[in-house]
Curated annotation (Swiss-Prot):
Binds 1 FMN per subunit. GO terms for biological process: pyridoxine biosynthetic process. It catalyses: pyridoxamine 5'-phosphate + O2 + H2O = pyridoxal 5'-phosphate + H2O2 + NH4(+); pyridoxine 5'-phosphate + O2 = pyridoxal 5'-phosphate + H2O2. This is Pyridoxine/pyridoxamine 5'-phosphate oxidase. InterPro entries: Pyridox_Oxase, Pyridox_Oxase_CS, Pyridox_Oxase_N, Pyridoxamine_oxidase_dimer_C, Split_barrel_FMN-bd. SUPFAM superfamilies: FMN-binding split barrel. GO terms for molecular function: FMN binding; pyridoxamine phosphate oxidase activity.
Length: 213
């Protein structure tokens, strides 16, 4: 079957963006855009594409949820034994992408990921719903399983083991991404999009520049 995709396109025209309109700090500017996405009721505004490269040199990507912005770092949580967890142990450099089509915007972030302190992971894990905490024990993430029944059986087993308080599994926790390159993209007519790039400087400040679309 052949698909005709050539004529599928939208014309973007909602807003403009220039380096002069942006805050000096890239993460502060990101928080403004994130809050605007939340206020606009964009579905899953914290969903981001996380791309990583494993020890085999192969890239992989998936959607994960941003769970915090603290001290200039972006936090997310996962199973450390999953494919992405193992990739980040082998190569900590990542690329993140947020796409908010309702606002005709995307944000591209590059940086280095590192595990957060255990107490930070403990605090977030304790805030999760009971069934989600059980799922962190039941799912041997990214490993092949015989059937869905295997997963259901494991969830029931851990539910019996932890009927009330579910401790955080040692193989589950957070990563914090320290960004060094952040690009803000605003869709514009005729594909003449606005792109503003922040680059981290040796003194900890950020430079801003406009990129060709």
């Amino acid at each position: 079957m052949s698909l005709n995709l050539a004529d599928i396109r939208l014309e973007y025209s909602k807003k403009e963006l220039s380096p002069e309109d942006c805050l000096p700090d890239a993460v502060a500017q990101f928080e403004i855009w994130l809050n605007e996405a939340i206020a606009a009721q964009v579905p899953e505004p914290t969903a981001m594409n996380l791309a990583a490269i494993g020890a085999d040199g192969r890239p992989s990507s998936r959607i994960v949820l941003l769970k915090g912005v603290e001290d200039g770092q972006l936090l997310f949580y996962t199973n450390y034994q999953s494919r992405k967890g193992q990739a980040l142990e082998a190569n900590p450099y990542v690329a993140l992408n947020f796409f908010w089509p309702e606002l005709e915007r995307q944000v591209r972030i590059e940086g280095k990921a590192a595990r957060v302190a255990p107490e930070v992971s403990d605090a977030y894990f304790a805030s999760r719903p009971y069934t989600s905490r059980l799922g962190a024990w039941a799912s041997e993430q990214s490993r092949e399983i015989a059937s869905k029944a295997t997963l259901v059986t494991r969830a029931a087993m851990f539910g019996a083991r932890y009927p009330i308080n579910v401790p955080r599994p040692p193989h589950w926790g957070g990563f914090a991404v320290v960004p060094d390159r952040v690009e803000f993209w605003q869709g514009r007519p005729s594909r003449l999009h606005d792109r503003v790039l922040y680059t981290l400087q040796p003194d900890g400040g950020w430079s801003r520049s406009r990129l060709a679309p």
